[in-house]
């Protein structure tokens, strides 16, 4: 196996972390919408935690992207 092929495989494997992050973000927003649908008065309290959860979960995807790009171009 050539080094370039190994880089592509490694970058693809490192990018797999973005799949889990996408699923997590979907779950966060789905549960936020369901919670506000059940109790609209709780929107102000729940919305902040939804944004914080989104940011933390999305950071994992960004870390996976950085690792994939480092494997590919370094």
Curated annotation (Swiss-Prot):
Principal cellular location given in the protein's record: membrane
Site (Reversibly protonated during proton transport): 58
Pfam families: ATP-synt_C
Subcellular location as annotated: Cell inner membrane
Matches recorded under SUPFAM superfamilies: F1F0 ATP synthase subunit C
Keyword set includes Ion transport: yes
Keyword field contains Cell cycle: no
Transmembrane stretches, start-end: 8-28, 52-72
Membrane topology field: Multi-pass membrane protein
Superkingdom, natural source: Bacteria
GO molecular function per UniProt: lipid binding; proton-transporting ATP synthase activity, rotational mechanism
CDD domains, per database record: ATP-synt_Fo_c_ATP5G3
Cellular component aspect of the GO annotation: plasma membrane; proton-transporting ATP synthase complex; proton-transporting two-sector ATPase complex, proton-transporting domain
HAMAP family: ATP_synth_c_bact (MF_01396)
Function: F(1)F(0) ATP synthase produces ATP from ADP in the presence of a proton or sodium gradient. F-type ATPases consist of two structural domains, F(1) containing the extramembraneous catalytic core and F(0) containing the membrane proton channel, linked together by a central stalk and a peripheral stalk. During catalysis, ATP synthesis in the catalytic domain of F(1) is coupled via a rotary mechanism of the central stalk subunits to proton translocation.
Subunit (UniProt): F-type ATPases have 2 components, F(1) - the catalytic core - and F(0) - the membrane proton channel. F(1) has five subunits: alpha(3), beta(3), gamma(1), delta(1), epsilon(1). F(0) has three main subunits: a(1), b(2) and c(10-14). The alpha and beta chains form an alternating ring which encloses part of the gamma chain. F(1) is attached to F(0) by a central stalk formed by the gamma and epsilon chains, while a peripheral stalk is formed by the delta and b chains.
Name listed for the protein in its UniProt record: ATP synthase subunit c
Encoding gene, per UniProt annotation: atpE
């Amino acid at each position: 196996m050539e080094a370039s092929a190994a880089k592509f495989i490694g970058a693809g494997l490192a990018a797999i972390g973005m799949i889990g992050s996408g699923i997590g973000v979907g779950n966060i927003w789905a549960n936020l919408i369901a919670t506000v649908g059940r109790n609209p008065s709780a929107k102000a309290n729940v919305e902040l935690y939804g944004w914080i959860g989104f940011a933390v979960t999305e950071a994992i995807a960004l870390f996976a992207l950085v690792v994939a790009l480092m494997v590919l171009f370094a």
